[in-house]
Swiss-Prot record:
GO terms for molecular function: peptidase activator activity; serine-type endopeptidase activity. Strongly inhibited by antipain and PMSF. Inhibited by benzamidine and aprotinin by 80% and 17% respectively. GO terms for biological process: proteolysis. Its EC number is 3.4.21.-. It comes from Acremonium sp. Residues 4-40 form the Peptidase S8 domain. Subtilisin-like serine protease. Cleaves prothrombin at 155-Arg-|-Ser-156, 45-Thr-|-Ala-46 and 316-Tyr-|-Ile-317 to produce meizothrombin(desF1)-like molecules. Degrades fibrinogen. Inhibits plasma coagulation. This is Subtilisin-like serine protease AS-E1. The active site is at 36 (charge relay system). Belongs to the peptidase S8 family. Optimum temperature is 55 degrees Celsius. Stable from 25 to 40 degrees Celsius. Activity is reduced considerably by incubation above 40 degrees Celsius for 20 min. Keywords: Hydrolase, Protease, Prothrombin activator, Serine protease. The lineage of its organism: Eukaryota, Fungi, Dikarya, Ascomycota, Pezizomycotina. Optimum pH is 8.0. Retains over 50% of its activity after treatment for 20 minutes between pH 7.0 and 11.0. Inactivated by treatment at pH 13.0 and at pH values less than 5.0.
Length: 40
């Protein structure tokens, strides 16, 4: 995998990683609320 360094960094404890590991069940059973004021 050739992912951006930020994704690789949060996916591994050690530095220098170039892959991203994602758990398929991550986020399961959660709710998200998005509030947008429309002002920018």
């Amino acid at each position: 995998d050739n992912v951006p360094w930020g994704l690789a960094r949060i996916s591994h404890r050690t530095t220098g990683a170039t892959s991203y590991v994602y758990d398929d069940s991550a986020g399961e059973g959660t709710c998200s609320y998005i509030i947008d004021t429309g002002i920018y």
